[in-house]
Amino acid sequence: IYEHQIYALRNDFTDQLLRYYSMYPTAATKVAYTGLIIRNNEAAVQVGLENYAPSLANVQQSLKLFIQFIQQQLRDNVHFVVLGHYQLLDALLDKSLQTPDILSMIEERNLSGLVTYLSTEHPIVQILKENTQQQLNVLEHYIPNDHPALVELKIWKRWLHTQGYKDIHLDITAQPPRSYYTGLFIQCHFAENESRVLTGGYYKGSIEGFGLGLTL
């Protein structure tokens, strides 16, 4: 840190800002950023918004702002959306079964392997057999309707519908990149530039937030 600026090699702004504001608390509830990140030994520009102590309305407003940026500055649009929640795995799979082998098979969507380890009737197998557009409907049969993850996913799906996005997919296979990612995540895939994905997710570590980021 030099003259109130952060200098560091980073592959992600969220983690860097989380560390910084843990050491130097701020009253700001929203932070916008842009800068270089290093991934796969290459530099790329990342832009993003972090919402601290986030409310649903604030996060959705930030997403609308980001989509406006995509439309106006990048001349692109969101083609389809992927939703997921990092609490789903614990809701669907007993802790004793969350072995490295089984988690790897879930991430790879290895149905034949999962049938061997879990059985054909296991909720994860039954959900993964369905088209990802239908998986949220199937999920309702396997966890209580008042489960926080299911409630949150339904809220987001309804809101996305009001914004005109009907092509919505569920991902139950994703595992958190860091331990503080504990809630809902979203991926907005572009219509024209298919390599670009606006990603976002809820986290709770030393501070609570919801970040949205896009690598250009």
Positions of PLM-derived features:
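TRNA-recognition modules of translation machinery and tRNA-sensing kinases, especially anticodon-binding
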Residues: 1-216
